[in-house]
Amino acid sequence: MVPMTTQTSHQIRSTTVLPAHREDVELHTADGLTLVGELALPVGPDGAPRTPSATLVTFHPLPTHGGFMDSHVYRKAAWRLPALADLAVLRFNTRGTSSPRGTSEGEFDGGEAERYDVAAAIELAEFRELPRPWLVGWSFGTELILKHGADPSIEGAILLSPPLHRATDEDLDRWAALGKPLVVLVPELDDYLRPEEARRRFARVPQAEVIGVDGAKHLWVGESAVRRVLDEIVGHVLPDHPLPLPTHWEGSLDPA
C-alpha cells in the first residue's frame, strides 16, 4: 500500500515567502547610472521560472523619508503574487537609494532626473520580454509614474496613496491623452490626498478610476490593508482571477 502524502497548510502572514524565482537585476539609465533591483517570477512544478501572465513594475515611496524597494507593500507583493496570481514583480531602488540589495548609483533629484529611472525600468521589462507590464507606484512612486510613465508600451498604471505634490495638471492631461487605464487607490485617512479631493483632481483623466479605501492610511499599515491593495492590483491586472487572494498556502515556502 502506497502511503498518502499531505502538504502542509501555511497561513500567509507578513513574513511568509511563497515560492518564486528571484534574481538580482541591474537597470541601466540613459544618463549612465546603474540601479539595483530584484525580479520575482512565477515557477512551474519543477521549480524553474516560467512566463508570467502579467508584470508589475513598481516604484517605491520617497527615499528621503524611508522609501525603498523593500517598502512593505512591495516586499509582500514580490513574496506572494508570483505564486498566488502568476505575476512577475520588478522592484528596484531609484537613484541614490539603498536597501539590503544594495545602493543605486546617483543622487535623489526630487523626481526630475528620476525620469531616466522610470524609462530604465520599462526598458528592462521590454528587454526581458515580460508580458503586459503595469506600472505600480506608491506615494512618491505615483509622482514618477504620472510625470514620466505615460508610455505606449505599458498596459496601465495603479497608484497607491498619490499625494499629487509634484505631478501637475499637464501630467494628468498626458495620461488622459494616452488613454491607458489609471487605477487610483486613495486611503480614507490619507495624510496628503483624500478620496473626495482625489476624485476632483483626477476628473481631468476620463479613464481614471478613483477608489476610496475606508479606514486606510497613507502607509497601508496592517495585513488587512495590504490584502486590500494586493486584491485590487490583481483584480485590475487580471480581471478573471479569483478574489480575494488566498490567506493560506498549501505546500513548501521559500526562506525569508
Which stretches of residues belong to each language-model region?
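Short alpha-helix in the alpha/beta-hydrolase fold that links the catalytic acid
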Residues: E170-L172, L193-A203, A225
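Serine-hydrolase catalytic machinery in alpha/beta-hydrolase-like enzymes
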Residues: E26-H28, L33-R128
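Acidic catalytic loop of the alpha/beta-hydrolase fold
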Residues: H165-R166, E188-L193, H218-L219
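Catalytic histidine neighborhood in serine/cysteine hydrolases
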Residues: A203-L219
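Short beta-strand/loop motif that positions the catalytic acidic residue
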Residues: L178-G179, V184-V186, D190
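Gly/Ala-rich beta-loop-alpha elbow adjacent to hydrolase catalytic centers
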Residues: V136-I145
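An N-terminal hydrophobic leader/cap segment in hydrolases
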Residues: M1-T29, L33-P49, F140, L243-A256
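Catalytic histidine-centered segment of alpha/beta-hydrolase-like enzymes
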Residues: A216-R228
